[in-house]
Amino acid sequence: PNASLSAAGALNRRTITALYGKPPVIEHVNRINDYSALLIIGTWEYYFTTGDIDFIKFIYPRAKALYDFIVSRLDENGLVVGRPGDWIFIDWSDIDKSGPLAAEQILLWQAHNAMAWLTEALGGDQKVYTERVDRLKAVINEKFWDEEKRAYIDTYTSGRRNVTRHAAIFAILYDFVDRETADDFVKNILENDNITKITTPYFELYELMAFCKLGHIEYAQNMIDSYWGGMLKLGATTIWEQYDPTESGVAHYGMYGNKFGKSLCHAWGSGPIYLLGRYCLGVRPTSVGAKNFKVEPNPGLYKELHGRVPVGNAYVDVDLEDGKLTVRTPLDGGTLVWNGKEYPIEKDVPLTV
C-alpha cells in the first residue's frame, strides 16, 4: 500500500531492506516460503516503478542471498517443499498442502523471473535464472495440470486432485498462462461458487487484481463494497486479518485457537488502495522508472472518479465528472487511453477529453 499512497520511496526502501535483513539467511521471511518469493518479486516491482538502480545495487546481494536460500531448499524437481522450520502458507483457506503446492511453485517461477530481470538491470548474466524459469514451467504443467478440470490442482501427491483459486490467480497475474486459459480460469474457477471462497482481505486483493486485469472491473467494485464494506458495517474502523461473511457474532474475532485472537487492524487488508489507483483510475508505468506510463481509467460502476496516483517519483491526478475526464501530471512520457483513443499527456498541462 505504501507505493500506492506516496511517491516518496524512502519508506519502501527501508521496508524492503528491513525485510531482507543481513546475510547469512537462515530462515524464510516470517518463516513463510511465499513471503520470501514475494519479497524478491516486490524488489523487481519497486525497481520497475522507480528506476532506482542505486538501491538495486545496494540490495541485490541480499536478494541474491535470499534467493540462493530458497533454491537450496527445493526438491529434486526444483519445486518448493516444506522443510523443517518452513511455513507453506499462501492463504487461510482449505488448500491441500499434503505435498508440493501449485500456487507456491508459480510464485517461485516469478521469483526466478524477477532475479533474471534484476540481474540483467545490473549488467549480469541471467542465463541460470531463465533456464530455471523454463524448466520449472515445464514441471508445473507436467505435475499440476489437470486437463479434465482445466485447472492446476493444489498438489499431485495426495490423489485428491483438489482445485482452489490460488494457483489460477497467480497464473493470471504473472502471465503464466495465455489469455484464453486465463479467461477459462475466471469462468471455471473464480466465478465457481463450488470452489472454496477466499476469506482474507490479503488474498482477496490478488483475486480482484486477476478479475480487473481481465476486464471484470464491476466484480471488483462490488466486492470492495460487500467484502471490505461488510467489515465496516459490523463496526470495523480498520481492516481485519480475516473476514468470513458467513460467520456471525463473536465468531468473527476468533483465530489461532483463541476466541479473540484475530488481528482487527491488519495492513494486509489495504488492497482497495491499490485496486482503485491501478484499475479504476488506471495509472501504471509501462517502462522502467515510469519513463513511459499510461492512464487508462475504467470507472465501471462509478459515475465520478477523483484521485491522485503515485507513478515514478511524482503523481498523476485523474478526475472524471459530468462526463469530462481531466488528467494532470508534472511528468513527461504519459499517454491517456480513453474510449478507444490515445492522447499524449503534456507535462504540467491539464488534458481534458
Describe the predicted segments one by one.
Residues 12, 71-90, 97-257, 346:
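Catalytic cores of carbohydrate-active enzymes
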Residues 55-58, 125, 199, 287:
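Short, surface-exposed helix-loop/turn micro-motifs enriched in polar/charged residues
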Residues 1-89, 97-115, 119:
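Aromatic-rich carbohydrate-recognition surfaces in CAZymes
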Residues 35, 166, 203, 268-271:
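A generic structural signal for residues located within well-ordered alpha-helices
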Residues 47, 211, 280:
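Active-site catalytic pocket residues across diverse enzymes, especially alpha/beta-hydrolases
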Residues 29-30, 160-163, 264-267:
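Short Gly/Pro-enriched turn/cap motifs at secondary-structure boundaries
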Residues 131, 218-353:
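Non-catalytic C-terminal accessory modules of carbohydrate-active enzymes
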Residues 7, 13, 18, 57, ...:
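Generic structural "secondary-structure junction" signal
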